[in-house]
A protein has these predicted regions:
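Conserved active-site-adjacent core of cysteine acyl-enzyme catalytic domains
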Residues: 29-31, 36-37, 83-214
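Active-site-adjacent structural segments surrounding the nucleophilic cysteine of cysteine proteases
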Residues: 2-107, 152, 160-163, 178
Length: 214
């Protein structure tokens, strides 16, 4: 039984931060209006954010272990990045596939909640976008952060990223449906803050052709 069915029944309804020179197609990056970054768990009528134990990635290719650790820390005392790198496994080339993250998340939490969601279409289809937003809301409402595998060309970067294509993993730890934004915990350290808001539209364009664990 999928977690979506379970949720309804219960009434609950980089690959290593690697850098590669590439121009990529032009994408209009939507800036997020200045808004406060919450320091922990918050909940309003339109938004929810989760408390996590944040760590920057300890090597240039451990974004997968670091993002996985951030997600686990919302629910348990998370293991070290080294342990998670061994379990995924992660090499000097990074973490190959988001499905490895899904497996490790479920193993540590003793659950089948997390599923691997692929987004092979670039740009994503409306159905893929709708599923991503629904997954974000459902997971965050149930205190499960989402881990996303992204490909960010120079024309479509989150805050502070260098002018190269970035293959990376980061963690979604909140959302705000009032302005369709998502709160990102980013282990790379490119941005001036550990967490920052992205528009949902930008997140949806960063994930293809990779995927996410939700």
């Amino acid at each position: 039984m999928s977690k979506k069915v379970q949720a309804v029944l219960s009434g609950l309804v980089l690959t290593g931060a690697l850098l590669m020179p590439a121009a990529g197609p032009a994408v209009a990056v939507e800036p997020v209006a200045a808004k406060a970054i919450p320091s922990g768990a918050t909940k309003t009528l339109t938004a929810k954010t989760l408390q996590v134990d944040f760590q920057y990635q300890e090597t240039g290719y451990w974004c997968g272990p670091a993002a996985t650790r951030i997600a686990l820390s919302a629910r348990i005392a998370a293991p070290s990045q080294q342990q998670l790198a061994n379990e995924l496994p992660t090499t000097t080339n990074g973490t190959d596939w988001i499905g490895q993250v899904t497996r490790v998340l479920n193993n540590h939490l003793g659950t089948g909640w997390y599923e691997t969601k692929e987004m092979p279409n670039d740009p994503p289809t409306q159905g893929q976008r709708d599923l991503l937003w629904n997954d974000i809301v459902l997971d965050i409402d149930n205190n499960y952060p989402i881990v996303a595998n992204i490909v960010a060309p120079a024309s479509n970067h989150p805050p502070g990223y260098p002018n190269y294509t970035i293959y990376h993993y980061f963690t979604v730890i909140g959302y705000d449906s009032a302005d369709m934004t998502v709160l990102i915990a980013d282990p790379a350290g490119f941005a001036p803050t550990a967490t920052y808001w992205l528009t949902f539209n930008q997140l949806a364009t960063l994930i293809p052709p990779k995927g996410y664990s939700a």
